[in-house]
Amino acid sequence: ARVPSGGVDHAYITNALLAELKTSLTPHTDKELRSIYFGGGTPSLAKPAHIARIIEHANRLVPLANDAEITLESNPTSAEVGKMAAFKAAGITRYSIGIQTLDDSVLQRMGRLHTGAEGLAAVDRAKALFSGRVSCDMMFGFEGQTLSGWRQDLETVLDHADSHLSLYQLTVEPGTPLFRDLNAQRVMLPEDDAQAQMYEAAVELCGARGFRHYEVSNYAKSPGAQSVHNMGYWQGRQWIGIGPSAHSRFTDPASGQRLRTVRIPDIRRWAQNCMERGHGTGETEAIDGAEAKQEAVVFGLRMLDGLSNEQFMRGNNSSVASGREPLAEYLCMERVRQHVRDGYLRSTGDLDHLAPTERGLQVIDSILLDIIP
């Protein structure tokens, strides 16, 4: 989302969010909310009172489950850490802190406003308020990073970590300054082999501290510490995104059709549309049966627990899933068997269940390209 110069009117944006929330949730009042996730930007810059209004409004429209997970993403600046207790009072139950790295020079190049020491202090503060419900985000594969430096940083973060870690490999998006710098050879990232070693080091070090690797980039100390919200994405559940650039996947109650929607990215145009017509949706597209099947496999095999044939055939319980063939008929079985023999996939029965091995999870994108018709 593009934020206009001079900042935004918090009250106006909150009212736009509430309008979009009402329009989006009203058709689903027979459901319950399993999770709410404030992310995609820096939601911790919002006023806690406005976060509370959004949670209360959502709960009035579609009741929150008794054990609903309500996460807030935050950067560990002193201003945001100072609001942590107020966010808990507003209804936040889980706190996700974007440490990224402990290298202060890299944080400066990223434009981050915190130091590595402040990142660790924020984790300690969050643990006191959200014990067992704190996640730390770290990144690897950036310029100048070495395997030994990554191992040292991760060991230090693990000394402070609570129950969940998200460890992301740096991705370079086309059109970004980093993309242009790479093409001009002004920046050199670690070689692919070095980044693979960093990934393997993360699995090793987290495992030694009791963090189970349950998804490509995610580690949890117990099943209860896994991100309920993100698991919803990977398991093909319905989600509704509110706000500029937000994406949604849900089944339309009227037609039974699975839909994909994207909100308008420009924050001013999005807010104006919300106030005038109740939502800022820019695109709506029906997801056909072929795409729904592909998504089920792509998302399901991002998890170490994988995908069962029953889950695949059930789909999202919408009309596009009716009559879906078994996994063994959908996938290229010759290639699946080869990856099983090579130790990248594991399966039971006649593909009653399919999952990546730890080794396979590291190269799952190339495996998916090979087994999906």
Positions of the model-derived regions?
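Short amphipathic alpha-helical interaction segments
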Residues: 321-341
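Short, amphipathic alpha-helical interaction segments positioned at domain boundaries
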Residues: 358-373
